[in-house]
Amino acid sequence: MGEPEPVVALTEDAPLSVYNPNYRSDNALIADGDSSPIGGDCCPAEAVAAAEEVATAALASEEIYEMHIKSCISSTTCGDHNNSIGVTSGLTVRAAECHPPSPEAVGIEDVVVVQTAATTNGPSDTVPASAAASVISDDNGCVPLLGSRLELENYDLESGCYYSESDNETASLFIQRVGRRQARRHRRRRVALTVAGVVLVAVLCAISGIVGAFLARVFQ
């Protein structure tokens, strides 16, 4: 094996840094194999000051980078920025590409999905025969669809028809059903008024007959 090359002492132009492999904690730069201090002008205080200066510059550059990112995010016209920010020791930190936040969705309406309750023919949901017979109507052939209690509750006792909200009922069928119900109401009203008029006429005729008989007997 060859002899190791002697280590040359650093000159004044060499940077003082804790990263220097020849730096020792005994206030000197010592060459390998030599215990005598070399370069007495070199002191650890200068090295520490240089290291602190580098750390301060790095911290300042990091703060500038964070400020740039925050300002870029807060701006709506940021776009793609690749600004280079200088850092000590010849290093360069490129700002990450920042994009403006996506605009909030405006004008979106909530869609409500209505699900129809499935009817079952189980023994618990079936209507008793007596209840079914009590609600069946033969007026205009309108017979309620009997099945579950929910369907029985939707049955309109006044019109005698089953009120269905299913998709099978079109607009024309709905209008026809409402028209039949209105016609039945008007017919019932006309019948009631006719009966009331007949009763009133009969009562007036009876009263007039009684009064006429009384006056005829008085003035004989």
UniProtKB/Swiss-Prot annotation:
Q: Which residues lie on this side of the membrane: Virion surface?
A: 216-220
Q: Name one GO biological process term.
A: intracellular transport of virus
Bilayer topology annotation? Single-pass type II membrane protein
The protein's location, in the record's own words, is:
Virion membrane; Host Golgi apparatus membrane; Host smooth endoplasmic reticulum membrane; Host cell membrane
Q: Where is this region: Acidic?
A: 151-169
Q: Which UniProt keywords apply?
A: Host cell membrane, Host endoplasmic reticulum, Host Golgi apparatus, Host membrane, Membrane, Phosphoprotein, Signal-anchor, Transmembrane, Transmembrane helix, Viral envelope protein, Virion
A GO CC term attached to the entry? virion membrane
Parts of the chain on the Intravirion side: 1-194
Q: Where exactly are the transmembrane stretches of this chain?
A: 195-215
One family from Pfam that matches here is: Herpes_US9
> Could you tell me which InterPro entries the record lists for this protein?
Herpes_US9
Task: Provide the primary localization.
Answer: virion
Q: Which residues carry this modification: Phosphoserine?
A: 164, 166
* Post-translational modification remark: Phosphorylated on serines within the acidic cluster. Phosphorylation determines whether endocytosed viral US9 traffics to the trans-Golgi network or recycles to the cell membrane.
Q: Where is this motif: Di-leucine internalization motif?
A: 145-146
Could you confirm whether the keyword Phosphoprotein appears in this record? Answer: yes
Sequence similarity: Belongs to the alphaherpesvirinae envelope protein US9 family.
Q: What does this protein do?
A: Essential for the anterograde spread of the infection throughout the host nervous system. Together with the gE/gI heterodimer, US9 is involved in the sorting and transport of viral structural components toward axon tips.
What's this protein's name?
Answer: Envelope protein US9 homolog
The beginning of the lineage is: Viruses, Duplodnaviria, Heunggongvirae, Peploviricota, Herviviricetes
